[in-house]
């Protein structure tokens, strides 16, 4: 069994696209982990150029995207702009 790594977490206020957050929360719920744990895993995999999700999880993500109307893709990431308040 892998050795546990002790870390220090900090609270942060991050703004995310509304539908993206719903998908992330839904995915975290299906994995029975916190949103923070999910985000840490995604980022750590990305930092090493590794895919964070397997085929089954990608299917779950596709389903959650449909449920929440999320049509954004990786190509959208550099094009996002907020509506003026």
Which residue ranges define each predicted feature?
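Short Lys/Arg-rich basic patches
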Residues: 1-18, 25-28, 69-75, 82-85
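Short, positively charged interaction helices/loops
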Residues: 48-85
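Acidic-enriched, low-complexity/disordered segments with a strong bias for Aspartate over Glutamate
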Residues: 29-32, 37, 63, 71
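Short, basic amphipathic alpha-helical segments that act as recognition/interaction helices
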Residues: 31-58
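Weak global preference for isoleucine
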Residues: 6-7, 33, 42, 61-67
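Extended hydrophobic secondary-structure segments
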Residues: 16-21, 36-39
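Activation segment
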Residues: 24-25, 47
């Amino acid at each position: 069994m892998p050795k546990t790594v002790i870390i220090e977490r900090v609270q942060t206020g991050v703004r995310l696209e509304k539908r993206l957050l719903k998908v992330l929360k839904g995915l975290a719920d299906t994995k029975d982990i916190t949103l923070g744990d999910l985000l840490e895993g995604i980022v750590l995999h990305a930092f090493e150029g590794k895919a964070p999700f397997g085929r089954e999880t990608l299917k779950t993500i596709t389903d959650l995207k449909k449920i929440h109307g999320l049509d954004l893709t990786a190509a959208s990431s550099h094009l996002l702009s907020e509506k003026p308040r």
